[in-house]
């Protein structure tokens, strides 16, 4: 077991705060419309350029164990904010540093850390209530675009594309972000149900230019088991041929003789057919096939119910307006399912989401819900270089998460203004002693820091701007760091999701409270062994040589 290094009191906290300062100084430069990029060296490939606070925070690991403990605590505030609200990571970092620094000064001056924490908690809860009261629900596409624009560092195109995607698939719909293979940035909307299984043979392709199989008005056969022999299916295949309509087979797998027979019939033109594997695994596969059955008004042929392929009639097959199958995906458009049955299935999945305690199960259920209740929108992000595409993709993902948060809990005035004005009612809070009052004062001062940092990143004096705004009674009155003007932030479209602002403050206060109430720190003692030489940027596995 490694020997331990033990530090006590203010010395331990001071060293932790040094680590917090190192991380916060790297992250804070990204805040606001005029925040800067950070370049991060990576073990392999080209460096990463980002303006995403949590990406910067996650990349930092300090050599000194005690300083690193502080940095890791601060990193946890940024990470938690990103997980819960999807944005606000830099704000959380700036707030946590300010709260921890001021709190430590007072602990060193003899204040009771537990009472300081109680005072801070009182203040934070009051600010959270103030944020909730001042939040405004967003409904219009324009407001959604504004949130996306601000969260993506003022990129209007990103805001507009996210708003368009949400309009197409609904606020609850599935929106994914992918790298495009060209320079453009597009929204591709897939109407209907899409799942990640492609055709089992390229011979099923009907459009050789796009390499997709397109089936118009097809029948859909859903079979729970593997298909290795078509003999039991002959009656149903003959009925489909007579109807002169295409057939899509979705089964656990189609293999051997069965697949070969389908391919031969497809090539001879006797049967327009395509086969794909069923999506998902195990019980989830069965549930997804039942979803498809309801969506297409078909039946899942399952031996659990005593159903056999040879007894299946054409009435048991589902139907849809169109099915498009690529090498990797299948899209069922306009299934002919009964609307009432689909709504009942949606309600059933929603109740399962409410009951489950597993995050993984919840995510998979939400995917099923989205597939049934809406379409799928794909934001395809392009650019001139790989570095540019990755940087922009990061911003798109941030903006998408922030927009979802805005739809959920509404928006407040942006640019740090809401936190600044929310500090004013805190002076009226009732406390039990002067130490708790000092805890409230810590929060009041810290709430000025995000706005100060935004202004300073824009090249102006943060203290002067804060003073001017506090003189103004209008809570929406703020400083537009992009145009360097004082404006009504809501009217100017400078808005933040209430959930992002709230989460940033709560996570920051949680971490700061841990730091000021820490009295002893135990870390592994540094090893005397010489560390191996680190690889320099270059070819991985080639001794770090640069050519």
From Swiss-Prot:
Composition skew (Gly residues), residue ranges: 537-547
Binding site for ATP: 30-33, 51, 87-91, 415, 496
Chief location category: cytoplasm
Endpoints of the signal sequence: none
Keyword Chaperone: yes
Enzyme kind, highest EC tier: isomerase
EC number: 5.6.1.7
Subcellular localization, as worded in the UniProt entry: Cytoplasm
InterPro entries reported for this sequence: Chaperonin_Cpn60_CS, Cpn60/GroEL, Cpn60/GroEL/TCP-1, GroEL-like_apical_dom_sf, GROEL-like_equatorial_sf, TCP-1-like_intermed_sf
GO biological process, one term: protein refolding
GO terms assigned for molecular function: ATP binding; ATP-dependent protein folding chaperone; isomerase activity; unfolded protein binding
UniProt KW keywords: ATP-binding, Chaperone, Cytoplasm, Isomerase, Nucleotide-binding
Cellular-component GO terms for this entry: cytoplasm
Chain spans, region Disordered: 527-547
Pfam families documented for this protein: Cpn60_TCP1
Catalytic activity field: ATP + H2O + a folded polypeptide = ADP + phosphate + an unfolded polypeptide
Quaternary structure, from the entry: Forms a cylinder of 14 subunits composed of two heptameric rings stacked back-to-back. Interacts with the co-chaperonin GroES.
Family indicated by similarity: Belongs to the chaperonin (HSP60) family.
Entry function: Together with its co-chaperonin GroES, plays an essential role in assisting protein folding. The GroEL-GroES system forms a nano-cage that allows encapsulation of the non-native substrate proteins and provides a physical environment optimized to promote and accelerate protein folding.
HAMAP family in alphabetical order: CH60
Protein name listed in UniProt: Chaperonin GroEL
Source organism (scientific name): Rickettsia rickettsii (strain Sheila Smith)
């Amino acid at each position: 077991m490694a020997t331990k290094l033990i530090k006590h009191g203010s010395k331990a906290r001071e060293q932790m705060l040094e680590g917090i300062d190192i991380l916060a100084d790297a992250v804070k430069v990204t805040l606001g419309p005029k925040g800067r990029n950070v370049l991060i060296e990576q073990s392999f490939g080209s460096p990463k350029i980002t303006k995403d606070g949590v990406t910067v925070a996650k990349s930092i690991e300090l050599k000194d164990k005690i300083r690193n403990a502080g940095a890791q605590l601060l990193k946890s505030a940024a990470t938690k904010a990103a997980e819960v609200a999807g944005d606000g990571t830099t704000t959380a970092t700036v707030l946590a540093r300010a709260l921890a620094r001021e709190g430590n000064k007072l602990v060193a001056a003899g204040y009771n850390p537990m009472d300081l924490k109680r005072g801070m908690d009182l203040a934070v809860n009051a600010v959270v209530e103030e944020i909730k009261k001042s939040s405004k629900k967003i409904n219009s596409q324009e407001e959604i675009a504004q949130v996306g624009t601000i969260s993506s560092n003022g990129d209007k195109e990103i805001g507009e594309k996210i708003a368009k995607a949400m309009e197409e698939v609904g606020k609850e719909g599935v929106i994914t972000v992918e790298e495009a293979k060209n320079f453009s940035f597009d929204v591709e909307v897939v109407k209907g149900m899409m799942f990640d299984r492609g055709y089992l043979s390229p011979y099923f392709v009907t459009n050789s230019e796009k390499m997709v199989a397109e089936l118009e008005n097809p029948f859909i056969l859903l079979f729970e088991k593997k298909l290795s022999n078509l003999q039991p299916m002959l009656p149903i295949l003959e009925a489909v041929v007579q109807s002169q309509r295409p057939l899509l087979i979705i089964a656990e797998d189609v293999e051997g003789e069965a697949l070969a027979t389908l391919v031969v019939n497809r090539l001879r033109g006797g049967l327009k057919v395509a086969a794909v594997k069923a999506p998902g695994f195990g019980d989830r596969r069965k549930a997804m096939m039942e979803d498809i059955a309801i969506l297409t008004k078909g039946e899942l042929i399952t031996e659990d119910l005593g159903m056999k392929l040879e007894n299946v009639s054409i009435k048991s097959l589902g139907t849809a307006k169109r099915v498009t199958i690529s090498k990797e995906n299948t899209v069922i458009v306009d299934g002919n399912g009964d609307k009432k049955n689909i709504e009942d299935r949606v309600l059933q999945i929603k109740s399962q989401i409410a009951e489950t305690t597993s995050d993984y199960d919840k995510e998979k259920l939400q995917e099923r819900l989205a597939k049934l209740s809406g379409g799928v929108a794909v934001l395809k992000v392009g650019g001139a270089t790989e570095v540019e595409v990755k940087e922009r993709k990061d911003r798109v993902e941030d903006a998408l998460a922030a927009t979802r948060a805005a739809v959920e809990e509404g928006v407040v005035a942006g640019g740090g203004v809401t936190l600044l004005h929310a500090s004013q009612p805190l002076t009226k809070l009732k406390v039990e002693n002067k130490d708790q009052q000092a805890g409230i004062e810590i929060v009041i001062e810290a709430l000025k820091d995000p706005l100060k940092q935004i202004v300073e990143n824009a090249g102006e004096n943060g203290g002067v701007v804060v003073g001017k705004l506090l003189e103004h009674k209008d809570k929406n009155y703020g400083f537009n760091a992009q145009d360097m003007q004082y404006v009504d932030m809501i009217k100017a479209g400078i808005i933040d999701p209430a959930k992002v602002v709230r989460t940033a403050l709560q996570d920051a206060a949680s971490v700061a409270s841990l730091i000021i109430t820490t009295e002893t720190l135990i870390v592994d003692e540094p090893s005397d062994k010489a560390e191996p030489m680190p690889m320099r940027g270059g070819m991985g596995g080639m001794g770090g040589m640069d050519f």
